[in-house]
Structure formats: C-alpha cells, structure tokens
C-alpha cells in the first residue's frame, strides 16, 4: 500500500536511494549511533530478574514528577544479550557464522564461482533471518517452525559445501573446535548422513544431532526457562482486568486455561545423552516437572574426551563422579562411546558403568534424550515398537507425542514423524524402561500467552546392582530412515 501511494504521488514526490541522496547533499555533521533498538527490545534482551527491575524502574519514572524527557537516558540491555540469555540461539548463530566463514574461504580459492556455489550463499543468508534468534512478545525463538526453517537452511548450506569438497563416499571426520565461542572446545563428528556435536563440559552431552538428507536437527529443543512475564499470566483465557492494554507490548491475555501448571523450569539444558542417577522415590511427574532427586553429579559437569579416526570415527567421553546412596557418597565411573563409519546409516552408542568403591551399590541409572519432531498434535506422529524382523515396520503403535507415559522394558523404540516421512529408532541390547513426555514452554506471542511444543524427552532407565570389580554395559544403535510405505 505504501509503495502504491508513492507511485500515485510521482508527479510531485521525488524518491531516491540513500546513495544518490548522499552524493547530491552535504552532510549536516558527524554522529555515532549507539547500539540501541526500540525501548521494548532493549528490555526483552535483559535477563529475567534484571528485566523485572528495569520494568519497575521505568514505571516509577513514568509515574513520577520527573520530566518524561529524562526517560530517554534510561536504557535496557544490548541485542546480543539474547545470545547469552538463550544458549540455543547462540549455538544457532555461531553455527551459521562458522559456515559463512568457511564458505567465503572456499570461494576465495575459486577462479570461477558457479551458480551452484552461489546458491549456497542464499541458504546462508536465509539461515540468518533474525526473528528466530530472539524473543519478546511475538514468539520468535519460542516458535519451533521458525527454528526448523533456520536449521534446514543451515544444514543444507553445510551439506552442499561438503559435496563440493568431498566425494559422498569419503566424508568422515572428528574435530575439536570452539563453535559457540565460550572458550571451551566442542567435539564434532560426522559423515554424509549425520552431524553430531558434543559438549564435554556439559555432561558429555549431544548439543546437535543432524540428519543431513532432510536438513533436520533433532536436537532443536528449547529448554524451559523462567521469563519476566510469567508472573503476569492470568488464571483464565479472559483478558486481565488489571489494566487496559495500551499496545501489543502490554497484552495480558491467555490462550488457554491452566497455563500456570505448565510453568516448569529446567535446571539443566535439554540436550541428549545426559546421564542420570535418580533418587529411589522419583516419579515420572517429578521428572517431567524437573523437581526430582538427582543423586549423581554427571548432568552438567565436565567429562574427559578422546576421539579416534580410522576406518570409523569414535568419540569416548568418561567421568568419574559421585552418587549419593542413602547417606553415603559413592564413586562411580561412567564411560560412553559413539561411533560412525563412512557409510553408516546409524550411530553406535555404548555405555560402561563401573563402581570405583569396593562395595555393592544399587543405583537407578537413566540416559536422557531430548528430540525435536515436527508436531505433537499430528496423527501421523506417534511412538511405536519396531517389528523385530524389519525396523521400518510397526509391530505395535503406541501413543501420540503429546502424552506422558511409561513403556517397557523393550529392546527397540521408535518415533514416527509422519509429517517429515522419517522414523527415528533406538535399539538397545539391554531392555530398558522408558519415560516419555513432551517438552512444552509457556511464552508470550501477539495472540497472548501460549503453550508451545518444543520436543520430547525420552528417558531410558535401568535399576542396577553394581558389584566391586564388575561393570554394567549397554549398547544402542540410533538410526533415522525414511518411513516405510
């Protein structure tokens, strides 16, 4: 409409580009612009506690006798605070920055840049669409479909670059690099089908698991965090009667009743391959709410790492930590190994747990995966038990992805993402019980406060009796494949 009005006024209104105006007009003076955006954006970028304090301060200024012109000197945060506030955003941003750097390095070595190579640049630009990297009142980072689109372009751009450098049958690598620029090294492992990124300092966990053929990051799960506006959520879907909203930034509506019951906050980041030692009285509801007894010190603590690259790529992560057994602290060693080959269609995972003390101990061990799927509501998406003769076939259809449930013991467990046409299957040699529940956040959007599906938590767990000089071992294969017709 705006451009239409410009065209209608072309007989008296002359338009020009900034470049043309600068060439024909002298500057009025010099100015250095501050690193600012509009007032609300600078408030949203602050940490939760600081955001509430800032909101209180600005309200006091507005209600005070101070001249309102003074308010412009009160400033909130800095946009890049979003990258510190949300590690998932930072990881996404640093990944695409790294890919962009590698792309330009590759292009600088070419005498002629082909249309195919130029198309990679478009994917890189698309992956930098800003709305998925931050959050205010418009959903943003909390909207999974926005992050899915970013990851699809990001993974595709990287995959296309790899095909320029490596023949499909030759790609296999392990690397130690500080991807997220936090001064700690991550470990990367991959082939033409999968990318796996580990954080040794955060429980030896998997930060990113990519299935390259479809451009899917299965680790695209957002951790449940407290937001400054959570204390303003009304009890009913009706608009709050506290005050009339003056703008969309002040909306006080709730899209459904009972949202406060979903205000569960995680004390650790929702990654995968997290190693739990549960209190004997832990229930699935306590675990869902992240208010349970964690007896070990493995979840967010550092692991030592070793990797090898030969016919296959292997990464071994291990930690000797402590587990509370009743009123005593017992030393336990956890070692986990992941491996892939050049042509591997799956990822091999193995665990070895050994007691370091000379006494029998009983522990409840769990291995946690947090995985993102296209939808929790779609009927085409569900849990299932794979057929023993063909893992692509469903032997038993289980519940949908919105349910909280316990299954098992089972050797194999599958998640069908019918909207994507993909099955993710985990097969264990040691039958495991499984807790499953959706990871859902409560966030603000232009339509009001809402619940958003971020992914599913799968906890494979075993009750073990560990004896001196013995070990418990379990092997797993994780694979992603197109859904069988």
Question: How does the language model describe each region?
Answer:
Residues 22-26, 132-134, 142, 196, ...:
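Flexible loop/turn segments at secondary-structure boundaries
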Residues 192-306, 311, 320-322:
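Acidic-aromatic substrate-binding/catalytic surfaces of carbohydrate-active enzymes
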Residues 360-364, 370-437:
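Active-site/ligand-binding surface loops and adjacent short beta/alpha elements
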